[in-house]
């Protein structure tokens, strides 16, 4: 678990994206409690105290290679957590940046924070050498699917029967180029 001081990775407007550290656990738990809709929709459950620790300690599955993994907090000018992101680089292949979670505080839905945060994330990924961007969106999360389509992502695969809490879901794997790299090149590099 990361106990070092938080490291700033990118900024946007009055926000900063920092790596989560152990001292952030109570604030992360409060964020989940104040914004339960995602867990209700995707896992059919209420937030629980262990969600904060799971966010902080989560890593990609052992069968997938990756270079770096970040549990990011989107903090406002007063250091309040208004969003969470999980990012893995070079997953499942060199040049692929995988965004496994992006969650914005419910009270800020519809106010442009997700758009601004995503734009800053994409700029950071591109500046850091990403060739392709990918993510998975749970099929029943229609609002998220539409958001990602507006960001230029296209569905390239469906993974059925993915365990999300106690639920089995269909996950839409979505992709977009971050550099002059084609879908064919991506599929050759990352066949999963």
Predicted regions and their residues:
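Acetyl-CoA-dependent GNAT
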Residues: 2-15, 19-25, 30-109, 115-120, ...
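C-terminal "cap" of GNAT-fold acetyltransferases
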Residues: 12, 97, 131, 138-145, ...
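Catalytic cores of transferase enzymes with a strong primary signal for eukaryotic protein kinases
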Residues: 31, 35-40, 64-66, 134, ...
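Residues at or immediately flanking beta-strands
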Residues: 71, 132-134
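Short coil/turn segments at alpha/beta junctions that flank glycine-rich nucleotide-binding fingerprints
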Residues: 111, 127-131
């Amino acid at each position: 678990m990361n106990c070092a001081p938080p490291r700033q990775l990118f900024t946007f407007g009055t926000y900063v994206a920092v790596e989560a550290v152990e001292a952030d656990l109570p604030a992360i738990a409060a964020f989940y409690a104040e914004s339960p809709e995602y867990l209700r929709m995707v896992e059919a459950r209420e937030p629980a105290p262990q969600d904060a620790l799971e966010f902080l300690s989560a890593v990609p599955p052992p069968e997938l290679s990756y270079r770096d993994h970040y549990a990011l907090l989107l903090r406002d000018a007063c250091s309040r957590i208004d969003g969470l992101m999980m990012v893995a680089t070079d997953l499942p292949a060199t040049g692929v940046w995988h965004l496994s979670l992006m969650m914005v505080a419910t009270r800020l839905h519809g106010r442009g924070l997700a758009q601004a945060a995503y734009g800053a994330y994409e700029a950071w990924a591109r500046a850091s050498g990403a060739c392709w961007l990918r993510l998975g969106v749970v099929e029943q999360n229609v609002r998220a699917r539409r958001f990602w389509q507006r960001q230029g992502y296209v569905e390239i695969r469906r993974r059925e029967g993915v365990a999300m809490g106690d639920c089995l879901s269909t996950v839409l794997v979505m992709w977009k180029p971050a550099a002059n790299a084609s879908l064919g090149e991506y599929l050759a590099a990352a066949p999963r």
